Amino acid sequence: MKIAISMEMTRKLRDTWHAALSHEWYDFLSQHDIIPLSCHGKIPKTDEFDLIIMTGGNDMPDIKTWRDNNYPVRDEYERQLIQQCQLTRTPILGVCRGFHFMNWALGGTHTSMDTPYDSTTVQLSTFEVVCHHSIQIATLAPGFEVVQQDNKGVVELALNKSKRMLGVGWHPERAVNTHTRTYILDLINTL
């Protein structure tokens, strides 16, 4: 499978922006060809890929107004990437921030969590995952269905089969058990 994957934006010395991709992604997708996307420049021809992954990292801007955005270049790039994938019917996997951004870009809403998840282990229906987020889905974008919620009702996995999109609230690339990794890879194959 040929996979394009967005990278997190980081600020280093002298206020210079850098694009970064965790090495865990290479381990998670070791059987596939991975093409990192720096979130700058031209949107790739998405129909040349079997899957686009919008990764985590970078906090979301204000969830009500979408202002105070510290990563406007990444947000605009990923918004255009979603539009292009819809035109070419290229499947998208949104992970953590990627899931929340995808939901927002397609008409869903979010709310702040009373108690943010900071490396918090949460129980899903058949397995546990470790989550890192301070916002949660309030309403899913049209066409998405809840696949997994945690024991507090936080949506951790949603699917839109008609648009070929899967949103995951945790980081499957960091999962230590093979069941969780296999579960996500199997869902990707249904898109």
Write out the residue ranges for each language-model feature:
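N-terminal beta1-alpha1 cap of cysteine-dependent amidohydrolase-like domains
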Residues: 1-97, 103-104, 116-123, 134, ...
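Post-Walker A helix-loop "phosphate-sensing" segment adjacent to the P-loop in P-loop NTPases
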Residues: 107-111
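Beta-propeller blade-edge signature
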Residues: 125-127
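Active-site-proximal beta-strand elements of phosphoester/diester hydrolases
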Residues: 129, 166-170
